[in-house]
Amino acid sequence: MKKKILLTIGCLIVLLVAAGGGYVWHVLHSVRSTAGQMYDTGGGSGNHQAITSKKPINLLLLGVDERKNDRGRSDTIIVTTLNPGKKTMQMISIPRDTRTEIVGRGTTDKINAAYAYGGTKMAENTVCNFIGDIPFDFYVKINMEGMSDLVDAVGGVTVNNKLDWYDEGYYKKGYHYKRGEITLDTGAKAMGYVRMRHKDPQGDFGRNQRQRDVIMAIVRKMSSVRSVSRYQSILKALGGNVKTNLTYDDMKNIVFNYRDAGQHSVDYEVKGSGKMINGIYYLVVGDAEKQRVHEMIADQLGD
């Protein structure tokens, strides 16, 4: 459940856990400078001891649309919990239109507005409050334009498309996305695929699923890359579009300590009711659903 990995593109964590130890270990030895380029403490310094001790960790994955002179909003919000003991990776997506308190601002708004108002830290505090005051150990933020760069870097991806439509939206390229297995051979074509919402009867939920599919397709493609030139293109795409408070050593420790967490994956999207409030559409999440999400995360963080 996620709008644009995730890192859902997936996000660096998904890539590290899902790609497998051997190849990623080789990669990490070669990406110290890239890791340094990605390192940022905008969301806090991180809980490095948890990774060293092989404790369950909670990560906030943000997909943002940042452009020059525009911070944008975090249209992808995924709470990812890794538990090496239970060998599970749980990913809970929070729809961008979710109505909630914006912590630090004293207002109620769409949850994706927190990033626009106060950057990573306000987004982290707001999501933490929404899930019942469960803190995050780390965050990973990707500029979603970077998904386009990554698809180009891996040489395109193949996905199973459940709908049939022409792109008349964000890119307006007129691409025809046929139902069934299709190849998104360029970043632009992939972006048109993951951004479409209005032609999908499931709206945001359907878009989130397509984004997850593309993220995992990127993960699979990355895990099989052996070309040096392709590898360098991937590093460039990551370094230019990802920010995280995970250090290089944290990434290495994730490879060793959390590789089993990818054996069982739990994917969930927060549910609610769509409502118009003062002329604005929101997804209103009930208390029972919030409690369910809180308990799902708390359970995964238990030993």
Predicted regions: what is each one?
Residues 2, 10-11, 19-303:
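Non-catalytic, solvent-exposed segments at the cell envelope interface
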